Amino acid sequence: MPGGRRGPSRQQLSRSALPSLQTLVGGTCGNGTGLRNRNGSAIGLSAPPITALITPEPVRHCHIPELPLDGGLLFEFLFFIYLLVALFIQYINIYKSVWWYPYNHPASCTSLNFHLIDYHLAAFITVMLARRLVWALISEASQVGTSSMVHYAALITARLVLLTLCGWVFCWTLVNLFRNHSVLNLLFLGYPFGVYVPLCCFHQDSRSQPLPTDCGYLVQDPLVDDGANGMATLVRPRDFLSLLRESLREQFNSTPSIPSHSCPLSPDLIRNEVECLKADFNRRIKEVLFNSLFSAYYVAFLPLCFVKSTQYYDMRWSCEHLIMVWINAFVMLSTQLLPPKYCDLLHRSASHLGKWQKLEHGSYSNAPQHIWSENTVWPQGVLVRHSRSLYKAVGPYNVAVPSEVSHARFYFLFHRPLRLLNLLLIIEGSLVLYQLYSLLRAEKWNHTLSIALILFCNYYVLFKLLRDRIVLGRAYSYPISSYGLKPH
């Protein structure tokens, strides 16, 4: 009506009905930053930190059962037996004879051409393959308590006799090999060590960032403590002899102890724990790769280098045997050095670390954004800016550095606890299936014998992987709330 009371206009009604931005999101929501309007400028609002507004979901861990793991001495013995079987198979593939020919044929008396085999080379390879077993025996004998001086003297004498015997056989085989072979062939004897040491030196000296030194809460014994304290000095240049001594000591060391996880609450402690675990995992993977390649080299490749030019052998089958030995040795060493308890430790640390997803510029322009702070625990779904980029929190508990690629890689590998176990199971299962297929199509007696012997060893490894996968799959699928655990 013309003379009546006018109500509020549409524009005034819309403005009064909508709450303010500060009421919706609580102001800046953390770390002295503000929201952004449509023009991109920041609105300076004072508000409590984001952890006071949104509580991050607490990290809960599953309890996994204690799965049996082979002891260090037992594993080294089984691994040595497997390598000897693989070496015997390679010699069969190279020096087999046609023993079913008539007896007047020159190569019909035995199944192998024993007169062509270099026994000095076979003894040298055996000594090189037994290095870990010998050191495991010495380490186990050193840890046994001595009740009397007689017992202690007997242990010292046994260690000296064992080391003297191995050293004498090693020197005796080297002298005979130097007499009977050319220099080019002799270079293949120490090729793995000649390649490993420069690569190890380059890897250690090329580190640009020192590892954290406050990793004492991760270790359980002095052996691991010494290794953790020494990791901080990797960036300092050292002479070649010290690197060589350290590299050789790593090759003779037994299985390292598994670190512990203390569920730290401070973001700095979580990142330091991740750095220490990352260095420990890289050291274990380096040991797995080198020892598997070392074993395959001396078992399947080195005998081929000393075959006479007039000797015929199946090159394709010998190379296939080389690949099978390397894959199975890799899986065996991985199951020993990366047991389920250790993988669960990495999974727990990755759950505390979290992950950030990088977003495109212009996306989420109207959503609240914050400046990333290293002292803040960020909940899931929060948008932060770091190094001129926009990131979104993926994990329920995020303390990782958004621009740190190693943190994202660590979370990707270990946030699923069964990822490594599934990978090893797929590799070993594929190898066993291929060997069964090759066994069905085998027509030569040496092919059938070699596949059957290797399969007998692979079945044991496959059984352990399947057992761990079934048990851990049930354990991780069990509801965490039923444990009655307190969140960390």
Swiss-Prot record:
BP GO annotations: autophagy; negative regulation of autophagosome assembly; negative regulation of autophagosome maturation
Q: Which GO terms describe its cellular component?
A: endoplasmic reticulum membrane
Q: Any keyword Kinase? A: no
Q: How does the record classify its membrane topology?
A: Multi-pass membrane protein
Q: Which residues cross the membrane?
A: 72-92, 110-130, 155-175, 182-202, 287-307, 319-339, 420-440, 446-466
Concerning InterPro entries, the annotation shows: Uncharacterised_TMEM39
**What are the entry keywords?**
Autophagy, Endoplasmic reticulum, Glycoprotein, Membrane, Transmembrane, Transmembrane helix
Q: Does the keyword Nuclease apply?
A: no
In this protein, the residues bearing a glycan are: 31, 39, 180
- Record localization: Endoplasmic reticulum membrane
- Tell me, what's a Pfam family for it? Tmp39
Give the protein family.
Answer: Belongs to the TMEM39 family.
The task this protein performs is described as: Regulates autophagy by controlling the spatial distribution and levels of the intracellular phosphatidylinositol 4-phosphate (PtdIns(4)P) pools. Modulates (PtdIns(4)P) levels by regulating the ER-to-Golgi trafficking of the phosphatidylinositide phosphatase SACM1L.
Name-wise, this protein is Transmembrane protein 39A
